[in-house]
């Protein structure tokens, strides 16, 4: 199994470190030819507008869309989740390039600025009974989950923070910033 981590911007190094810790040597994906080598792709947190623009510049939007869910499982964390959503609210003026692969609506920076970042327990039965500690940094919020897409993770107040659609996974938090590797292991099973 080959796992790529989109390494254009954001916290790709942290995802790579978790993958190595669980015995997977990741490929840092910066070019379309590297994308062709992977069966799974993690789109990390960072700045969604910047990552979207870089995907456009490096001509990777269409190759990712063409393979998504078929021979390419994709997991987006935070900014990566924004890029996977079919509807994004609170975009910068003029919009932003997205992959628009998952039937969900997501709101950018829903919890406020960097100063409003927080940690909170997450219920995610798909990875086990024990709550997961979620790290939310300028995090988006999943507003709604549409047909074919299912909510798989929640905050205590019922807010959806993780969704799955076939071989596509979106988390609005950063599992790579904790010692808990259960979401990474889940992704390897998609």
Swiss-Prot record:
Q: State any GO BP term from the record.
A: pyridoxal phosphate biosynthetic process
Give me the Gene Ontology terms describing cellular component: cytosol; glutaminase complex
Tell whether Flavoprotein is among the UniProt keywords: no
Q: In which pathway does it act?
A: Cofactor biosynthesis; pyridoxal 5'-phosphate biosynthesis
EC number from the UniProt entry: 4.3.3.6, 3.5.1.2
GO molecular function, a single term: pyridoxal 5'-phosphate synthase (glutamine hydrolysing) activity
Which cysteines bridge via disulfide bonds? Answer: none
Q: Which domain of life is it from?
A: Bacteria
What stretch or stretches form a coiled coil here? none
| Residue positions of the active site | 78, 174, 176
Q: For this protein, what reaction is catalysed?
A: aldehydo-D-ribose 5-phosphate + D-glyceraldehyde 3-phosphate + L-glutamine = pyridoxal 5'-phosphate + L-glutamate + phosphate + 3 H2O + H(+); L-glutamine + H2O = L-glutamate + NH4(+)
Q: How does it assemble?
A: In the presence of PdxS, forms a dodecamer of heterodimers. Only shows activity in the heterodimer.
| Similarity annotation | Belongs to the glutaminase PdxT/SNO family.
Function description: Catalyzes the hydrolysis of glutamine to glutamate and ammonia as part of the biosynthesis of pyridoxal 5'-phosphate. The resulting ammonia molecule is channeled to the active site of PdxS.
PANTHER family assigned: PYRIDOXAL 5'-PHOSPHATE SYNTHASE SUBUNIT SNO, PYRIDOXAL 5'-PHOSPHATE SYNTHASE SUBUNIT SNO1-RELATED
**HAMAP family named among the record's database cross-references:** PdxT
> What protein name does the entry list?
Pyridoxal 5'-phosphate synthase subunit PdxT
